[in-house]
Structure formats: structure tokens, C-alpha cells
């Protein structure tokens, strides 16, 4: 979907979430609160086209097959990184901060 691609490239870090999603809140808190990233956060449950975008994200996250959890979906430098498990794994492995720096999302 063209809208997902357009929104995903609007900033160095873009997070697609839902307002009632605990894992979405955890990922957003990590990126924005703990790491200080100026991410664009899109709450799809508040967007009239959110359901269509969530389906597209599920397709991308699950290898084209759809199904499974679509949110949160995190893009860094316009590229899909993945969901909560992937972001947390990268952070614990020490790989998230360098990725964010390379995308221009962190300066320190």
C-alpha cells in the first residue's frame, strides 16, 4: 500500500501502533522515552484507513502471508525492522542504537 510506504519514509524512525496495544506502548517508550528518538508514531486505530494499513503491515511482517500480529511495526530509515520482538532483540544485542545512529535518528 502506497500510504504505508509514504508514512514509513517521513522520518528516520516511524512506528505504527494502536492506542490499546501494550507492546506498542513498550516499543514507543523505548524508542522515544529511553533512547530519545524523534519518531513519527501513527496510531492506526485512530486513522480512517488504519485497518487497511494494518493488513498491509501484517502482510509485510509475515512474509506476504498475512495473519499474525501487525503492530507495532517499526521502520528505520524507511526500511521495515519488524515488530516488538525484533526491536527488543536488537536492543538487547546492542544493535539497535547503531542502527538508529546510521539512520540519523540519534546523534549521541
Swiss-Prot record:
Disulfide bonds join 21-24. It is found in: Cytoplasm; Nucleus. GO terms for cellular component: cytoplasm; nucleus. A motif (Responsive for interaction with TGA factors) lies at residues 105-108. InterPro entries: GlrX-like_pln_2, Glutaredoxin, Glutaredoxin_subgr, Thioredoxin-like_sf. Its main location: cytoplasm. Gene3D superfamilies: Glutaredoxin. Keywords: Cytoplasm, Disulfide bond, Electron transport, Nucleus, Redox-active center, Transport. It comes from the Eukaryota. Residues 1-107 form the Glutaredoxin domain. Coiled coil: none annotated. Has a glutathione-disulfide oxidoreductase activity in the presence of NADPH and glutathione reductase. Reduces low molecular weight disulfides and proteins. PANTHER family: GLUTAREDOXIN. Belongs to the glutaredoxin family. CC-type subfamily. This is Glutaredoxin-C10. The lineage of its organism: Eukaryota, Viridiplantae, Streptophyta, Embryophyta, Tracheophyta.
Amino acid at each position: 500500500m502506497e500510504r504505508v510506504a509514504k508514512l514509513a519514509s517521513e522520518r528516520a524512525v516511524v512506528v505504527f501502533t494502536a492506542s490499546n496495544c501494550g507492546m506498542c506502548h513498550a516499543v514507543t517508550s523505548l524508542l522515544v522515552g529511553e533512547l530519545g528518538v524523534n519518531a513519527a508514531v501513527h496510531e492506526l486505530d485512530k486513522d480512517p484507513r488504519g485497518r487497511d494499513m494494518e493488513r498491509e503491515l501484517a502482510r509485510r511482517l509475515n512474509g506476504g502471508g498475512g495473519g499474525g500480529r501487525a503492530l507495532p511495526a517499526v521502520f528505520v530509515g524507511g526500511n521495515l525492522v519488524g515488530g516488538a520482538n525484533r526491536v527488543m532483540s536488537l536492543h538487547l544485542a546492542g544493535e539497535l542504537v547503531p542502527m538508529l545512529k546510521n539512520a540519523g535518528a540519534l546523534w549521541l
